[in-house]
């Protein structure tokens, strides 16, 4: 089913351009109130939603618009102010609310923003529910009678509740005493959350990217720009650096030598730590982009590996379908469903730190069994509407290349969703092998 407004992670765009305008967001709140809240079980007595945001300047405007939309539909609203996306998921479930809403564009620049929803159980909405909200958007917006309007109020203990939840996912018998951490909050929603979490567990914390001004979120700091973190780890003689993005649902880690570890490697580490603790891990879920070295390493440890479409929502769907608990993406979205219902950068960092504490080893030592395969990516510009899947020359080249890579590499070809480009990606044990195969495939397309 084609969706008009919802993408892979809610509704997102440039502030001031449709659909991220105050009038549309108010109508979105009203439509979502009708679909999500009415009839939902709630501990508040009346349908009630939780609204949180990151630190973008536009969050004030969009928060007010959502508040108007929900209350006009007869739904109560609780406002948290700036809080990581996974914190909203947790509190929605913990407070027994009808739904949760986050105003954030995650790792995007400050001039973008978005709206995403969580169900009463703290899960991302399935496609069918998003389609129902879109259908409700096409209906006239009819305000509830005055006696039925919702109320809005701020809750003051949201940050403290979420900090305690994060700490509860770290083994009680362990602590972080003697560990020096640099924590990069991307000037985003974790600025007042992440440093206290690690400090209260005993770490010596150096916080950077923790002075949001509404316009500096993700700007040169955070999981998508780790250079400042690498510098700070070295300058402070820290043991580790942790980088979150603007809404703190993704994680990148830097060791004392300045080496950066991505989500693929961290997923492997968490799986192996669960096994070391005596837990059965039947399988893990990655995406089409997960490095093949991780897949092979997991299979050597008896762990099945499945690839989902790119996007943490699809990783989550695959995990739920198989009743597995661990999955993630190279970008740093990591899912530990035995700890939280959604991807959580802070909780993921605590799982990594727990593995280090339990093993007494360094990151490099724990990941010695995973040497990421080199990747070669070639973007081939094509005519609009070009069907690469039936291109005879490409199919012939692929048939020649793939047997050479079997067990030592793989091919991924996909069309860009935003421009007339076909992306040819090859990864292999040796860089030369990947480059040679990618060039052969790109040449077949006429690059």
Curated annotation (Swiss-Prot):
GO cellular component terms, semicolon-separated: cytosol
Pfam families documented for this protein: PGM_PMM_I, PGM_PMM_II, PGM_PMM_III, PGM_PMM_IV
Keyword annotations: Isomerase, Magnesium, Metal-binding, Phosphoprotein
Cofactor: binding details: Binds 1 Mg(2+) ion per subunit.
Sequence positions that bind Mg(2+): 106, 245, 247, 249
NCBIfam families: glmM, PRK10887.1
Name assigned to this protein: Phosphoglucosamine mutase
Gene label: glmM
